[in-house]
């Protein structure tokens, strides 16, 4: 197994992370190296990833340090140790969420909704801060008196947010993703978790968003979840034909939130209701109410 690692300045992390997710949508390991440097790593079998000597390179205009190493034959056990169960505690009146990989034991708590996600299939297992923050906001949203209703998950990845929404009673739920692997993974995960989710392959930059036209969408107040990176969220703000009732946006570095909130506010009239931060990452809840 090959481990391809890229070290980058924290302020340039977004660009590198986006490129690595294109290379390996199955997941990216994040290692903090002090205050100013972060390392991202992806794993693949020989031939799946380039095996490179240590070098200085560039992603666009961003300087990075790249290294490629072979890791021992017990890589699968190491990979499993990297993916641990995640418990998302709820507000009052809403069940907790327990997200686990299939090799971990179920929760012994009676008050949880359990979600089983295979981290080897697509990005998004609940372990990364951006996914976790979106799950926290989704629980808050599910506790509103007039929720849940229809939900659109843009960039569904492994389907963890769409599955959580279905577990919490949102319906219908539609997941969109550009990657074939993500569409297949979400369908598989929905079956494993016993929920009904529609999944479509979709290109945000080339196709019109479904469900935002009243003639096309389901009845009820639409919730949109978009755990994307900043450039795609700005594209989403420009491309939405009308505002949803609620929007949960993740995948942001904490210093990018104001720009994204401003874009959705200026274009669609959405306003910030709540912001969550974990380390350098952030997610935000915008409302049209």
Model region roles, listed by residue range:
Residues 144, 178-288:
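S-adenosylmethionine
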